[in-house]
């Protein structure tokens, strides 16, 4: 059998498995067998790239990022539907339909859940998917073709035969509840942005300019109709959907037929009762006159059809009473209010607590203890207080007061005004945060700090979950993260959950954590607004804990993706005497940071005097003006000392005056000199006499990990490579420097062989790390 024949066989088999899994909901093979076939196809296509076609099941990984989406005009407008909020609204719709058709007997309707996602159009030509577009304003949408190709249950090629030359399919891209939970958990673990609800997650994922991001998101598609079609494919709405299903397009498993409005109402009530158990979010039900001839007879009004309506569910809201407002203390000491409610069922779940976020939210709501409020389960998950019902306020309703002492440790609670910073300016906002000043003497802060410190993405101390940490704190065995390294066997054994074996495993894990990467250590410190990726940026760019501790806020903004707000959080954290003491205690406990070294060479070389000037808050002087200024005056001293004549030879009069005015202020002179001094001390340069700091050994190299590593996890291997300056990618390309391949390596290994990329097995990789001074 030739490779081409086998590739065609595999594609056909995988397409059939996809159809049975996504459309019929009847998986025909175990996941492991599907993966084996898929990997075989990927490997064959890697060996024979000229045989790769756009409709191959392997072509869903996403391509190069776009600068912007292009516009797509809908040949048949994507109209919105009218809404019914009450049963009376639906009955009135039914009356209008009967009147418009003037026919005896009950009108036939199709019934489908209204998925809460993003409406899209898919265009197939001769059975091949050629375009995907958003609804937009109904007339013009955005071309998201690269992104829709990554959605697993959208067929790249239609099944069967008999499809028209041109077929535009319309439907909803959505995210299941389970997929949404997995995505948010992964985002939170990586220190990334989490989403408020599945709809936002689906919309944000589908509108990514980088389709590789879309490919990583658990999106699904459900077809609900057609747009332009070159020939008729049915005479009823349900008939068309069943035909689309036969061609491989997923339709709702809840699609039903109803005879008359009363059966529609019965469907609505049934779906409403089962709403919480459905695997996806819905916000109502859509009813359509089933006959296409009847649809044509009824026609349209304004921008909506007369033959369809969306019967919306009521918002997931209920009334209840605020019994009290209590205050919780978080890891950073923030004291936040929580409403204790008279228990009430909202969307089938009993709610007795609701978040109030902060005192600003309480002020916005005008909330008092004793008030009747509207509670909503936002996204059907997080109970929130939406509104106070003022007409029900009792005479004895009490204002909410922030405690002057911490409810956990009794320390003072301080109010701090929120500050917004932009370059050199500080703006005090109306908001404020309340914090317990007890630090690690506060049990709540200590427990949360330790839980964060030992977490998998931080110091990765296995065996210390939340309950274990709470127990160690409550027993008085740990009062700071450094106390973990003082724990003795006799102190731990016998505590709940700790027998002799588990105690020794815990102590071994604690000891092993003394050799973290710099990035892990920084992340474990729990600096406000510093997630895992920001910690990696700090470690990779600055190269040592000392530089991170010393860095001025303005210098930190030179690092990728660090703005002034986060820069001040980092700087203030390391300036704090209490935090300095905690860090020193950790270092004194035997901590050995594994990858400290020089400043990143590309970072040092990329910093210029013009770049520094552009970052100062000089009115009307941006990057271009700064370049002109430095071309004329090539040192900070010359710029500060320059008179109006010198400055006007480089800049327009307005800009020159702004520079002179800025540097008249001695505080601005000092700030600029301090920034320059630190940049030069760190190894950055803009003088030919300054030597560029040597880079890390793998700086500028891209590595790929594949297969199962037996002597370390993939995460640890990635950390070690990044500590040497490498970028770790998820796929092999011509730019890949080296592939580390463990047992079970598949298509990535084949791709590396095809491209002639260097490959190391695990033993060779461990030897390489040892040569770089990194132990495993």
From Swiss-Prot:
Similarity comment: Belongs to the NAD-dependent DNA ligase family. LigA subfamily.
GO biological process: DNA repair; DNA replication
UniProt gene name: ligA
Active site as annotated: 114
Function summary: DNA ligase that catalyzes the formation of phosphodiester linkages between 5'-phosphoryl and 3'-hydroxyl groups in double-stranded DNA using NAD as a coenzyme and as the energy source for the reaction. It is essential for DNA replication and repair of damaged DNA.
Protein name, per record: DNA ligase
Catalysed conversion reaction: NAD(+) + (deoxyribonucleotide)n-3'-hydroxyl + 5'-phospho-(deoxyribonucleotide)m = (deoxyribonucleotide)n+m + AMP + beta-nicotinamide D-nucleotide
Start and end residues of each BRCT domain: 693-776
The entry's keywords: DNA damage, DNA repair, DNA replication, Ligase, Magnesium, Manganese, Metal-binding, NAD, Zinc
Requisite cofactors: Mg(2+); Mn(2+)
SMART domains: BRCT, HhH1, LIGANc
Claim: Thylakoid is one of the keywords in the record: no
Organism encoding this protein: Pseudomonas putida (strain ATCC 47054 / DSM 6125 / CFBP 8728 / NCIMB 11950 / KT2440)
Domain of life: Bacteria
Amino acids binding Zn(2+): 406, 409, 436, 442
EC id: 6.5.1.2
GO cellular component: cytosol
Gene Ontology molecular function terms on file: DNA binding; DNA ligase (NAD+) activity; metal ion binding
């Amino acid at each position: 059998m030739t490779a081409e024949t086998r590739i065609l066989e595999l594609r056909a088999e995988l397409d059939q498995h996809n159809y049975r899994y996504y459309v019929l909901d009847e998986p025909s093979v175990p996941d492991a067998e599907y993966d084996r076939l898929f990997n075989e196809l990927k490997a064959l296509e890697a060996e024979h790239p000229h045989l790769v076609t756009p409709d191959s099941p392997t072509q869903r990984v996403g391509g190069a990022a776009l600068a912007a989406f292009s516009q797509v005009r809908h040949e048949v407008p994507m109209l919105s539907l009218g809404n019914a909020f009450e049963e009376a609204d639906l009955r009135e719709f039914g009356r209008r339909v009967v009147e418009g058709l003037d026919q005896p007997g009950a009108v036939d309707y199709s019934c489908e859940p209204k998925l809460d996602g993003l409406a899209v159009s898919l265009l197939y030509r001769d059975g091949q998917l050629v375009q995907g577009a958003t609804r937009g304003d109904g007339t013009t949408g955005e071309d998201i073709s690269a992104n829709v190709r990554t959605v697993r249950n959208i067929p790249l090629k239609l099944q069967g035969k008999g499809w028209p030359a041109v077929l535009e399919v319309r439907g909803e891209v959505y995210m299941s509840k389970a997929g949404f939970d997995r995505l948010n958990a992964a985002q939170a673990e990586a220190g990334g942005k989490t989403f408020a609800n599945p709809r936002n997650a689906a919309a944000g994922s589908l509108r990514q300019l980088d389709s590789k991001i879309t490919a990583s998101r658990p999106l699904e598609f459900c077809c609900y109709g057609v747009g332009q079609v070159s020939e008729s494919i049915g005479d009823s709405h349900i008939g068309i959907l069943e035909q689309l299903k036969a061609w491989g397009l997923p339709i709702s498993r809840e699609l039903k037929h109803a005879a008359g409005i009363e059966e529609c109402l019965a469907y609505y009530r049934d779906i409403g009762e089962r709403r919480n158990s459905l695997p996806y979010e819905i916000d109502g039900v859509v009813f359509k006159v089933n006959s296409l001839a009847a649809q044509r007879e009824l026609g349209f009004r304004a921008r909506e059809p007369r033959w369809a309506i969306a019967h919306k569910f009521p918002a997931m809201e209920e009334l209840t009473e605020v019994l009290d407002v209590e205050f919780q203390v978080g890891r950073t000491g923030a004291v936040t209010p929580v409403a204790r409610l008279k228990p009430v069922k909202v969307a089938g779940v009993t709610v007795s607590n609701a978040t109030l976020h902060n005192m600003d939210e309480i002020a916005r709501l005008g909330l008092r203890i004793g008030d009747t409020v509207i509670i909503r389960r936002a996204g059907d998950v997080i109970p929130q207080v939406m509104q106070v019902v003022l007409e029900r306020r009792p005479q004895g309703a009490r204002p909410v007061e922030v405690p002057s002492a911490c409810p956990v440790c009794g320390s003072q609670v301080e109010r701090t005004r929120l500050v917004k910073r932009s370059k050199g300016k500080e703006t005090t906002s109306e908001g404020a945060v309340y914090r317990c000043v007890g630090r690690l003497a506060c049990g709540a802060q200590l427990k949360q700090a330790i839980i964060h410190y030992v977490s998998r993405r931080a110091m990765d101390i296995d065996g210390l979950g939340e309950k274990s940490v709470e127990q160690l704190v409550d027993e008085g065995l740990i009062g700071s993260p450094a106390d973990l390294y003082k724990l003795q066997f006799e102190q731990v054994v016998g505590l709940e959950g700790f027998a002799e074996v588990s105690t020794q495993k815990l102590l071994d894990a604690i000891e092993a954590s003394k050799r973290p990467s710099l990035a892990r250590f920084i992340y474990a410190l729990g600096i406000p607004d510093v997630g895992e990726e920001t910690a990696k940026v700090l470690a990779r760019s600055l190269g040592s804990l000392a530089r991170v501790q010393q860095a001025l806020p303005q210098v930190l903004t030179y690092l990728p993706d660090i703005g002034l707000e986060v820069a001040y959080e980092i700087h203030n954290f390391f300036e704090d005497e209490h935090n300095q003491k905690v860090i020193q205690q950790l270092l004194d406990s035997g901590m050995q940071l594994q990858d400290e070294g020089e400043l990143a060479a590309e970072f040092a070389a990329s910093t210029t005097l013009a770049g520094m000037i552009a970052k100062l808050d000089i009115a009307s002087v941006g990057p271009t003006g700064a370049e002109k200024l430095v071309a004329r005056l090539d040192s900070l001293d010359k710029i500060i000392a320059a008179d109006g004549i010198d400055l006007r030879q480089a800049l327009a009069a307005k800009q020159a005056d702004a520079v002179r005015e800025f540097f008249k202020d001695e505080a601005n002179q000092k700030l600029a000199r301090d920034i320059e001094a630190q940049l030069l001390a760190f190894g950055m340069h803009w003088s030919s006499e300054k030597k560029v700091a040597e880079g890390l050994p793998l700086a500028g190299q891209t590595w790929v990990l594949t297969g199962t590593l037996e002597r370390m996890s993939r995460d640890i291997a990635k950390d070690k490579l990044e500590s040497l300056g490498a970028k770790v990618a998820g796929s092999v390309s011509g730019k890949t420097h080296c592939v580390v391949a463990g047992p079970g390596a598949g298509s990535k290994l084949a791709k590396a062989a095809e491209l002639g990329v260097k490959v190391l097995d695990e033993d060779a990789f461990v030897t390489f790390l040892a040569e770089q001074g990194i132990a495993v």
